[in-house]
């Protein structure tokens, strides 16, 4: 059974570009009686609210395809993959997630062979995400860390006694797993970050487990791995992670970098027809500013400031577009084009 623990579910995009829900419509009917009074909680009581899924807070979704860089996952211990030779899990899981997201048609993504160390500080992870997004021209960066993939009792599979070997054979022939104790864990941590600000949009821990009864080294994503109970549990977990990521990404505004030269009326937008842009589209203009942090010593924060001007796309190519400011002004500094 797969499970997920959310530590930071709400998107941390700047408040001035986040969608603000309008007032709830007033019902046409008037209640005939007042609702019963609600008891006030005691002063020392703490009320725990359940986490709200991203789809519940998203009132409108951009039809444009966001861009995502997926890094290889890091592994907490190199020895966890020895059983079964599952050393390709670090690259295999991000690849499965990329395929899952692209099937949902919410992103265009690329996959890297490098990862972001989770033991790094928050400032370091922010800077790494910004650098990867800038280098690979993407809006988001996904990183992960494999925390556990050990067997509860490896001896039951790899060094069984006479009776344990007979029990293993019975379970393998009958495919009855309710009393099979050859359980293997998978726990991992996912972190989705905005590539322009480096802020975390989704931080969540996932866990699943299954029976691992494979001999030798079948390798990750092989036919034998597909047939295993452990493999099926992982594929189910990938589907859950893909749904969570797709919901979070769908609620974010579409943002693309702008290449503007001083005194040049035409600018280049770092997105094009592959993301769904069309000639004649208009986009909001935001300035990208780096300011000293008010809460962290010797640190900086990235802010997006909305400008009273709009961009109109003139020519759209597969990977980029050209545009001009509607009011004919010139740009000087770092700017972003945004469509919600």
Regions found by a protein language model. Name each.
Residues 63-154, 199-203, 278-281, 286-302, ...:
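N-terminal segment of the mature soluble domain
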Residues 74, 150, 196, 210, ...:
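A generic structural motif
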Residues 123-196, 294, 301-302, 315, ...:
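Surface-exposed short loop/turn segments
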Residues 226-252:
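Short, structured interface segments
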Residues 263-279, 324-329:
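A structural micro-motif recognizing beta-strand termini
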Residues 285-340:
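Beta-strand/loop-dominated core regions that host nucleotide or nucleotide-derived cofactor-binding catalytic loops
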């Amino acid at each position: 059974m797969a499970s997920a623990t959310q530590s930071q579910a709400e998107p941390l995009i700047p408040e001035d570009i986040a969608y603000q829900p309008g007032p709830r419509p007033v019902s046409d009917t008037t209640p005939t009686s007042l609702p019963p009074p609600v008891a006030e909680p005691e002063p020392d009581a703490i009320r725990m609210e359940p986490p709200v899924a991203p789809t519940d807070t998203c009132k409108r979704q951009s039809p444009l395809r966001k861009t995502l860089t997926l890094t290889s996952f890091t592994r907490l211990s190199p020895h966890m993959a020895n059983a079964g030779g599952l050393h390709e899990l670090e690259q295999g899981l991000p690849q499965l997630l990329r395929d899952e997201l692209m099937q949902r048609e919410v992103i265009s993504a690329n996959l890297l062979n490098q990862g972001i160390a989770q033991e790094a500080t928050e400032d370091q992870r922010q800077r790494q995400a910004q650098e990867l997004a800038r280098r690979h021209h993407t809006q988001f960066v996904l990183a992960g860390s494999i925390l556990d993939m050990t067997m509860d009792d490896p001896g039951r599979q790899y060094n069984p006694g006479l009776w344990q070997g007979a029990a293993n054979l019975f379970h393998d022939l009958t495919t009855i797993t309710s009393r099979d104790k050859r359980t293997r864990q998978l726990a991992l941590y996912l972190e989705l970050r905005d590539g322009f600000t480096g802020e975390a949009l989704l931080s969540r821990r996932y866990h699943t487990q299954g029976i691992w009864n494979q001999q030798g080294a079948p390798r990750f994503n092989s036919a034998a791995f597909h047939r295993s109970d452990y493999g099926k549990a992982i594929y189910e977990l990938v589907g859950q992670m893909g749904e969570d990521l797709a919901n979070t990404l769908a609620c974010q505004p579409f943002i693309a970098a702008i290449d503007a030269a001083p005194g040049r009326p035409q600018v280049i937008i770092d997105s094009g027809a592959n993301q769904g842009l069309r000639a004649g589209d208009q986009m909001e203009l935001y300035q990208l500013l780096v300011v000293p942090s008010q809460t962290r010593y010797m640190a900086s924060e990235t802010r997006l400031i909305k400008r009273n001007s709009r961009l109109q796309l003139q020519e759209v190519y597969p990977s980029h577009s050209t545009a001009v400011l509607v009011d004919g002004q010139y740009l000087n500094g770092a700017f972003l084009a945004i469509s919600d």
